[in-house]
Amino acid sequence: MEKKITGYTTVDISQWHRKEHFEAFQSVAQCTYNQTVQLDITAFLKTVKKNKHKFYPAFIHILARLMNAHPEFRMAMKDGELVIWDSVHPCYTVFHEQTETFSSLWSEYHDDFRQFLHIYSQDVACYGENLAYFPKGFIENMFFVSANPWVSFTSFDLNVANMDNFFAPVFTMGKYYTQGDKVLMPLAIQVHHAVCDGFHVGRMLNELQQYCDEWQGGA
């Protein structure tokens, strides 16, 4: 049986500093929002190639580090209560060329990149050819990463019905490209406004850029 880590802390909304914001964005102003950036991955890509790593799991690991560093990206509704997961794990798309479909596969997050890479590699080896939508099953404490490496974009919006209690961040990666002496990659993120404001997304994206600039290949 797969190990599932689902520890969490319950938020007392009545005492929460975001109480009014949460209630507003859960009722009259209910909304999610998307933001797309052109991430400079020049240094990151160079280090990935130098260390002969795979780009996809390396980038997923950086996103997972950031999601686990900030509580606003680990929130969910569970049994009618707002909770903060102790940890969240990346659920990422795996493309099946033969059927032109994809699967959503999750891997347990680990702080250490090499440990995570080992877990990721095992999961892909075990489930990567399985055509089911969720070949490994589903867990509650996930965030989502989707890859669209066939096209670059400057804007990307998800339109999902019934998002009132869906707080998990959703990332979409596009095709990276060269601009001058830089390599840029489109990256879109969707979050729920009830738990996450522009400040939080901005801080995370700035930290993401710093991680990409300084990444040392899991050393």
Curated annotation (Swiss-Prot):
Annotated Gene3D superfamilies: Chloramphenicol acetyltransferase-like domain
Catalytic activity as recorded in UniProt: chloramphenicol + acetyl-CoA = chloramphenicol 3-acetate + CoA
A GO MF term: chloramphenicol O-acetyltransferase activity
Applied relevance: This protein is used as a marker in many commonly used cloning vectors, such as pACYC184.
PROSITE patterns: CAT (PS00100)
Keywords of the record: Acyltransferase, Antibiotic resistance, Plasmid, Transferase, Transposable element
Active site as annotated: 193 (proton acceptor)
GO biological process: response to antibiotic
Pfam family, one: CAT
Listed EC numbers: 2.3.1.28
Membrane-spanning intervals of the chain: none
Matches recorded under PANTHER family: CHLORAMPHENICOL ACETYLTRANSFERASE (PTHR38474:SF2), SLR0299 PROTEIN (PTHR38474)
Function: This enzyme is an effector of chloramphenicol resistance in bacteria.
Protein name stated in the entry: Chloramphenicol acetyltransferase
Organism: Escherichia coli
